[in-house]
Amino acid sequence: MTWFGVWDPVWVGLVGLLFGSFLNVVIYRLPKMMEAQWDRDCAEHLGQTPATQAPTFNLMVPRSRCQACGHTLSWYENIPVLSYVALRGRCKACKTAISPRYPLIEIATAGLFALCAQRWGISFSTLAWCGFAATLLALAMIDWDTTLLPDDLTLPLLWAGLIAAAAGWTQVDLRTALWGAVAGYLSLWLIYWGFKLLTGKEGMGYGDFKLYAALGAWFGWPALLPIILISSVIGAVIGIALKFSSGLREGGYIPFGPFLAGAGFAAMIWGPDRLQAVLLGWIGGRSEERFSRNAETD
């Protein structure tokens, strides 16, 4: 590896900091944009006309501002991580505390981008996986905050996985990716309807189907079982912890998207083959242990 190549993760990680700053905007604004669109659609359906034109609100406009006092942030207050440290985690104008989640998301994005560069170097594969990581992180945070998995993110993630597979930028071929997308969607769809018929309740949303299909497109159908098992175990552990700490939301609902995303990150970092090997080893070990106990009993 050349001297420049050794520093690839650093340069790409710095780019990740910038993307992380933008992800904070996406995570906060996209759900609000969706709600505003739903309100407009409902008003149009009812034949209502808004009294005033709503101000422009999208991912670019208006500029970022303090949610407490409305202070518009200058460019030097928007520098990833450094601005938070320099301002000591408080708004420059009103001194209201700024959530540490903002720099943490920036750091997480930088770390994921650096891992991609470390693994694939400066290549189209790194570009593809950085896009995957950023989108998955945004989806996880939005779902945790709002229980929404926007089609504006899940569907592009799915199609990007198929395109990346066709271009040879992932570890799976297009056929395996296609089957992964189809199997991912249908499997959760069947579980959803089975649960609803048995209990009369909805155990998950359609966004979960699309996210699982997207993971199938990126990792192929063989990775679907390890991904769903890992996400289910993590979700169960966190759910139990929240229940005992009285941290569950009203109705006891926990969004499943963040746990699917966590399993997706694990598959990206360690590779789907290693996840499958760990799963098979665990199942094999449990079966062998059970067989030994039965033999001793006999």
Pin down the residues of each PLM region.
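Interhelical loop and helix-boundary elements at the membrane-water interface
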Residues: I79, K92-Y102, M141-L155, G194-G207, ...
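Functional transmembrane core segments of multi-pass inner-membrane proteins
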Residues: V12, S125-I234, Q276-G285
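Alpha-helical transmembrane segments
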Residues: T2-R29, M33, L190-E202, A213-S287
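Conserved small/polar residues in nucleotide/adenosyl-binding loops
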Residues: E288-N294
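Short microdomains enriched in Cys/His and/or Lys/Arg
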Residues: Y84-S125
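Structural signal for the C-terminal ends of transmembrane alpha-helices
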Residues: Q118, A140-W144, A165-W169, A241-S246, ...
